[in-house]
Amino acid sequence: MADAPAPAGGRGGFRGGFGGRGRGRGRGRGRGRGRGRGAKDGDKEWVPVTKLGRLVKDMKIKTLEEIYLFSLPIKEFEIIDFFLGDALKDEVLKIMPVQKQTRAGQRTRFKAFVAIGDYNGHVGLGVKCSKEVATAIRGAIILAKLSVVPVRRGYWGNKIGKPHTVPCKVTGKCGSVLVRLIPAPRGTGIVSAPVPKKLLAMAGIDDCYTSARGQTATLGNFAKATYAAIAATYSYLTPDLWRETVFTKSPYQEYTDYLAKHHGRGAVTAHPTEEKPF
């Protein structure tokens, strides 16, 4: 009888729940099962659910830049994995607990900030809140992939070698934090606080001066302002890009027939309503 309440406590408890039935084994099993599930998802073939995903998988769109050229929204993180793959590196910037006051007391969740980039012109930032740290990090990585933007790089002086810095001064703002990126000569390195330094390095910028003002201790806003500044490198045209624009068809327009023929749900049964008498 002494052991009778244990299952109820184990099932309903928060701290000791589930771990009550074999504490060490339960914890290890949970971790292992999580990893195994992730591995299965990795091995599973990607089945795209958006038109853009279908065009990417069928190799109709061959580069990420084609997507950015037409400002097509990316709704599947597998598209980023398809193009950038192993080149992508992610880093957890911060995990912070956040609380909400409820009738029952305080509900604590964990907020994760994750930066992602290929160190060669692509960078993203993801923020996710969840009950568990691992879930928050996983969600933040997915959101970071969906927010990947191209980075335009330029020169400080003469155009010798590969572009190494930002093309000109750019500014990003989030909350009270304002971040300014200033071109720097080759060999300077990234002169900045640790948070922008990680994002700029992941974006593939080798040399850069930075200036920040506002409440930079708020890491989330500091990271978002830096991300906005990096994204702003493609928001203007410099005189060397004042060429006449040649308009081309969007991939959706170009491959309309292909999408309708191969992937349309109503492609097999054409006009089923015509056969039914009313």
Curated annotation (Swiss-Prot):
S5 DRBM domain: residues covered: 88-151
SS bonds (residue pairs): none
Keyword check for Ribonucleoprotein: yes
Keywords: Ribonucleoprotein, Ribosomal protein
One GO MF term attached to the UniProt entry: RNA binding
Family indicated by similarity: Belongs to the universal ribosomal protein uS5 family.
Name listed for the protein in its UniProt record: Small ribosomal subunit protein uS5
Organism: Urechis caupo (Innkeeper worm)
Gene that this sequence comes from: RPS2
